Amino acid sequence: MSYTEIVAFKNQESNHTKDVKNAFRGAMAVWGLMEEKHLALKSAPWDPTQKLSRTSLMDPNGVKEIWELANNKDVPIDERIVMATTFDRVVVKRENFDKIIKAMRSFDKTYEGKSSILEQADIIESFIQDEDIDAVAWNQTSVNSNPWFDWSEEKEEEVPYNLSKNKDHWFLFDDLVFI
């Protein structure tokens, strides 16, 4: 079964992961729950009377509409923050762990535990105990390679992603204007 990986960074390098079973309960659940609450379902192209989610229609523009909820000021801020955690290459610095945990717990309460967000919040909260952990990130599904570990041709092995040296990431509370 697939899983969502929560990646801990120590001294700016990806260090280890904690897994949350069933990746479908992560990003896909967040997208579906928020779509259901904030957007009208779409008509199926083959039957306009049948209403379907944007993800089930595999409509790239429809999925973008879901992602845009992160910028929609009518959507509660905690929900927008959680939506942003589902985006590629997002990182949350230690100084913002309390904010992300609060947002995740609020999201879980709003959506009555219909996702793995509470489990993710618990993992991040456990990271607070380790003062060497300076950031967290997500690999939303284990069916792909983890973007937080690079391949070294020279060493012929996986090497940690470094937040100071590598630049293919962004910081949730620094780089998005909506927060």
Please give the residue ranges for each predicted region:
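Acidic (Asp/Glu-rich) sequence patches and key acidic residues
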Residues: 1-179
